[in-house]
């Protein structure tokens, strides 16, 4: 009985770790949103609507503003 209980617990632990590996890891992804400009909170609103993330306007080297969206994703 003790061996079968130990074997059962061991199998459950192995299966649990396999499921965790299959599901993937959470990470922070980022994407430039060209569909919007950076005026009046539109970057933040679009990022929140599309990816449930946080949008922020950043300035490029040629002094243009681009919307950068950071969101949680699975890799």
UniProtKB/Swiss-Prot annotation:
User: Could you tell me where this protein is found in the cell?
Assistant: Secreted
Q: List the disulfide bonds.
A: 29-73, 38-57, 43-67, 47-69
Q: Which UniProt keywords apply?
A: Antimicrobial, Disulfide bond, Fungicide, Plant defense, Secreted, Signal
- Annotated signal sequence range: 1-24
Pfam families assigned to the protein according to its UniProt record, in alphabetical order: SLR1-BP
Q: Name one GO biological process term.
A: defense response to fungus
User: What InterPro entries does this protein's entry cite?
Assistant: DEFL
GO cellular component terms attached to this protein's record: extracellular region
> Where is it mostly found?
secreted
Record keywords: Lipid metabolism included? Answer: no
Q: Which domain of life is it from?
A: Eukaryota
The similarity comment for this entry is: Belongs to the DEFL family.
Q: What is this protein called?
A: Defensin-like protein 127
